[in-house]
Amino acid sequence: MKKAEMGRFNISPDEDSSSYSSNSDFNYSYPTKQAALKSHYADVDPENQNFLLESNLGKKKYETDFHPGTTSFGMSVFNLSNAIVGSGILGLSYAMANTGIALFIILLTFVSIFSLYSVHLLLKTANEGGSLLYEQLGHKAFGMVGKLTASGSITMQNIGAMSSYLFIVKYELPLVIQALMNIEDTNGLWYLNGDYLVLLVSLVLILPLSLLRNLGYLGYTSGLSLLCMMFFLIVVIFKKFQISCPAEIAFLVNETVNSSLTQPATFLPDMGFNRTESDSCQPRYFIFNSQTVYAVPILTFSFVCHPAILPIYEELKGRSRRRMMNVSKISFFAMFLMYLLAALFGYLTFYGHVESELLHTYSSVMETDILLLIVRLAVLVAVTLTVPVVIFPIRSSITHLLCASKEFSWWRHSVITVSILVFTNLLVIFVPNIRDIFGFIGASAAAMLIFILPSAFYIKLVKKEPMKSVQKIGAMFFLLSGIVVMTGSMALIVLDWVHNAPGGGH
């Protein structure tokens, strides 16, 4: 360990003065679910730039001198916004339809504030613990168990994100092909079957890109994804004023939805909207039903960006914890508004008949709309190019765990890549609904990354604050809240699965 490495923090003494332990992992930089952050060392073998576990740069004789951040404040805000926004935005209208407007806003506010608070804990823990690597903080706090827990949570979150992207391909690509080919009768056409199309896209497009040894241009897909989601938001708002609320929406959703969804609307009778035709298009503010349990996991899934916080912090020009918190506040507030508007206008368009993937709901009432077709194409391109970015850190983590001391092997590289893709494709084919991905990952990995791990690391590693201090008591309360959220949400989701299993309720 070298003392010079700690100089790279460049923390203002008046702000973060504390005794740091040394750390050899500050050269770390990796892509999140949306972004591939630029590495300091472009010449490092990509497979050895460990994205999920501690870097083994001892073998590479690099300088560990003071390294100031080079990314501007505005670009850091953009990078963090890229890391936050993801496919979860497509499920927010469904969450609002099962909570009501007022309850959704309350939950969204609390989840965003809690997520921001966990960023505060994570940054302070990084300074005290002397590491800018999430998993290394786990190792410093709880040894190998902490390291594996952090690594496993991030890997689960990445697999969930990748699955949600492929679900979008499964849902939307058949509709795009149908619209482009002007096909009326879809019965028996294999190229309109979502399962076949996911396999085809994975084999022809995603696999070759995923086999690359470095990310290259794929790193720019983060910006493309954010732009696509902003375009999606604009279209959602515009369509609210173009689509009147037809009384027959429920019929349309159940009868005309494309076969790429596995029983897509069978959960509608259980949604708790017992209304007449006259009030079917009236907004509701508080709703409690069997699907309300998915709201918090969907929201937590949508706000996970914590593995990207430390790399962005490392790159920040004029690096200080206060400056990074300002970056986080602006990014979280921007995404809060974006999520709220997308959920609100999507809900006010379809009310209680929103599907778990909002974009697919439009196919029930506007099958041939050109603007929606453009949105679908943009989203499909973005998510298809993002999947290899997400595979990269998962593969690096597995390689490090299983073959850390071995030289690079194309055979091993290919087998791990194919295995990840096969596993994810099986999830997408056999898990009936994207809501289940949002719910399960949001209740497990996302809850770990937002609530449990940052607070646990803070309690363990920040030594200068006594356990009876307000800060430690707050962190302890946050930890307990995370455990309650995770166990409660998981239990209710499993109960919902069991309850609906006989009738195929998903």
Curated annotation (Swiss-Prot):
Q: Which family does it belong to?
A: Belongs to the amino acid/polyamine transporter 2 family.
Q: Where is this region: Disordered?
A: 1-23
Q: Which cysteines are joined by disulfide bonds?
A: C245-C281
Going by the UniProt annotation, this protein carries glycans at: N258, N274
Cytoplasmic face: residue ranges? Answer: 1-76, 124-158, 210-217, 314-329, 393-413, 458-472
What is said about the domains?
The extracellular C-terminal domain controls the voltage dependence for amino acid transports activity.
Q: Reaction(s) catalyzed by this protein?
A: L-alanine(in) + Na(+)(in) = L-alanine(out) + Na(+)(out); glycine(in) + Na(+)(in) = glycine(out) + Na(+)(out); L-serine(in) + Na(+)(in) = L-serine(out) + Na(+)(out); L-proline(in) + Na(+)(in) = L-proline(out) + Na(+)(out)
| Top-level taxon in the UniProt lineage | Eukaryota
**Which gene name does the record give?**
SLC38A2
Task: Please state how the activity of this protein is regulated.
Answer: Inhibited by N-methyl-D-glucamine. Inhibited by choline. Allosteric regulation of sodium ions binding by pH.
Which segments sit on the Extracellular face?
97-102, 178-188, 239-292, 351-371, 435-436, 496-506
Q: Where is Na(+) annotated to bind?
A: N82, T386
| Subcellular location field | Cell membrane
Functional note = Symporter that cotransports neutral amino acids and sodium ions from the extracellular to the intracellular side of the cell membrane. The transport is pH-sensitive, Li(+)-intolerant, electrogenic, driven by the Na(+) electrochemical gradient and cotransports of neutral amino acids and sodium ions with a stoichiometry of 1:1. May function in the transport of amino acids at the blood-brain barrier. May function in the transport of amino acids in the supply of maternal nutrients to the fetus through the placenta.
Upper lineage is: Eukaryota, Metazoa, Chordata, Craniata, Vertebrata
Q: Which organism is it from?
A: Bos taurus (Bovine)
Question: What name does the UniProt record give this protein?
Answer: Sodium-coupled neutral amino acid symporter 2
